Each structure stands twice: as C-alpha cells, then as structure tokens.
C-alpha cells in the first residue's frame, strides 16, 4: 500500500536535468543558457566547451546529465536530441557585510540561480 505513481510531467520524447544553487547571478547564467537554446546537443556541447564564461562548465555538466537521462532513463536516441528548453530561475541571495571607511558598511549580495535543461528527440523525416 504505497503512494500512487505520479504521472510523467514531460512528453515521452523529452528528458530534463536540473542544476540547483549555481553560484552566479540569473542574468549571467541566462546569457549562457540562451547560447544553447534550440540547438542540437552536439553543437551545444561544442559551444559550451569553447565558451569563455565561467559558468559554462556547470551548464555543460547539466546538459550532459540531461543527455544521459534521455539515453538511460527514457531510451531516446542521442543523435536526434535538441535542446528544446533551457531556462533560469532565481534561488536564494546570500547577504554579506563589507566594512567601509568612517564606520560605514555596505551590503554585498551573492546571488544563486537554478538551471533547467529539457532535451527533445526530433526524428529526421525520411524524404
């Protein structure tokens, strides 16, 4: 007598991976996420490999996780995968204190972000 199985939230031809609490602002992470949105996964991996952004390594790791989920958990063909969605959400913001001159202080905000990548299998139609 257990809980009933929850229905699958994604269609049968999709898989996703989520990277939480990435230590980067959502705006900066969205620049890298926009770089791979809508591309084939091999092209997206190559773009992330040669990107000069610091967070590109974490985005690449999340994309590789989504590809592995598609292959191992959902039996999708890796050669037909496309990044259908790559979206960013805000996580918490650490607030720190920085002592300034004349007894003053300044707040330092250290934002975190969440990244969700959804890959979809797009079959090439035989023409």
Swiss-Prot record:
GO terms for molecular function: rRNA binding; structural constituent of ribosome. One of its GO terms (cellular component) is cytosolic large ribosomal subunit. It comes from the Bacteria. GO terms for biological process: translation. The keyword Ribonucleoprotein applies. Transmembrane segments: none annotated. SUPFAM superfamilies: Ribosomal protein L22 (SSF54843). Keywords: Ribonucleoprotein, Ribosomal protein, RNA-binding, rRNA-binding. The keyword Calcium does not apply. InterPro entries: Ribosomal_uL22 (IPR001063), Ribosomal_uL22_bac/chlpt-type (IPR005727), Ribosomal_uL22_bac/org-type (IPR047867), Ribosomal_uL22_CS (IPR018260), Ribosomal_uL22_sf (IPR036394). Disulfide bonds: none annotated. Gene3D superfamilies: Ribosomal protein L22/L17. PANTHER family: CHLOROPLAST 50S RIBOSOMAL PROTEIN L22-RELATED, LARGE RIBOSOMAL SUBUNIT PROTEIN UL22M. NCBIfam families: rplV_bact. Belongs to the universal ribosomal protein uL22 family. This protein binds specifically to 23S rRNA; its binding is stimulated by other ribosomal proteins, e.g. L4, L17, and L20. It is important during the early stages of 50S assembly. It makes multiple contacts with different domains of the 23S rRNA in the assembled 50S subunit and ribosome. Part of the 50S ribosomal subunit. This is Large ribosomal subunit protein uL22. It comes from Methylorubrum extorquens (strain PA1) (Methylobacterium extorquens). The gene is rplV.
